[in-house]
């Protein structure tokens, strides 16, 4: 069992039940999935860039990546409907917990000039989204084999009903929010 999953069961559930006075253990918010998204707009000119992005995400997630395609044509961006312009992967279960552990303990501390995560990046329903400017903060990415530094979006979806519950859930995992 993943370390943070055990922490959730042993400590976080009790802490949140006490803090929000839940009557049932099933009311306690939990993380349901983590979505990683990498937009590669430059893939229009060079298809190899998308392949490198897919390889990076596969190394991070340990599972197959879905290539996202443009939904409609935009002349200003020189894209047509159906052009591959990014990739994403959704993590659930054990892989999600393993990635979350690496994100909190390894990747976030390696961010350059890090002053804490924005506590206002919740969507109103307890889900948290954050952007990472460099994929090289993850230990799975070999720095010497990186062709270009790319960023990615990381969305943590929870069962929390409010932002306050979601913030308390992530803070219980020692998520480094700005004060």
Curated annotation (Swiss-Prot):
The keyword RNA-binding applies. One of its GO terms (molecular function) is structural constituent of ribosome. Signal peptide: none annotated. Coiled coil: none annotated. PROSITE patterns: RIBOSOMAL_L5. It comes from the Bacteria. SUPFAM superfamilies: RL5-like (SSF55282). Keywords: Ribonucleoprotein, Ribosomal protein, RNA-binding, rRNA-binding, tRNA-binding. GO terms for cellular component: ribonucleoprotein complex; ribosome. InterPro entries: Ribosomal_uL5, Ribosomal_uL5_bac-type, Ribosomal_uL5_C, Ribosomal_uL5_CS, Ribosomal_uL5_dom_sf, Ribosomal_uL5_N. The keyword Nucleus does not apply. HAMAP family: Ribosomal_uL5_B. Belongs to the universal ribosomal protein uL5 family. This is one of the proteins that bind and probably mediate the attachment of the 5S RNA into the large ribosomal subunit, where it forms part of the central protuberance. In the 70S ribosome it contacts protein S13 of the 30S subunit (bridge B1b), connecting the 2 subunits; this bridge is implicated in subunit movement. Contacts the P site tRNA; the 5S rRNA and some of its associated proteins might help stabilize positioning of ribosome-bound tRNAs. Part of the 50S ribosomal subunit; part of the 5S rRNA/L5/L18/L25 subcomplex. Contacts the 5S rRNA and the P site tRNA. Forms a bridge to the 30S subunit in the 70S ribosome. This is Large ribosomal subunit protein uL5. It comes from Marinomonas sp. (strain MWYL1).
């Amino acid at each position: 069992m993943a370390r943070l999953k055990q922490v959730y069961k042993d400590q976080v559930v009790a802490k949140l039940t006490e803090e929000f006075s839940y009557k049932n253990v099933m009311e306690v918010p939990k993380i349901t999935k983590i979505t990683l998204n990498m937009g590669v707009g430059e893939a229009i000119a060079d298809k190899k860039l998308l392949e490198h992005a897919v390889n990076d995400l596969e190394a991070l997630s340990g599972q197959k990546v879905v290539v996202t395609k443009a939904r409609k044509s935009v002349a200003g961006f020189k894209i047509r409907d159906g052009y591959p312009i990014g990739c994403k992967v959704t993590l659930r279960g054990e892989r999600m917990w393993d990635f979350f552990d690496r994100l909190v303990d390894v990747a976030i501390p390696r961010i350059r000039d890090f002053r804490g995560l924005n506590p206002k990046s919740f969507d109103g329903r307890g889900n948290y989204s954050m952007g990472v400017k460099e994929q090289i903060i993850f230990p799975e990415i070999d720095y010497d084999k990186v062709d270009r530094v790319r960023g990615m979006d990381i969305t943590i979806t929870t069962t929390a009903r409010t932002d306050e519950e979601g913030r308390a859930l992530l803070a219980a995992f020692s998520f480094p929010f700005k004060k």
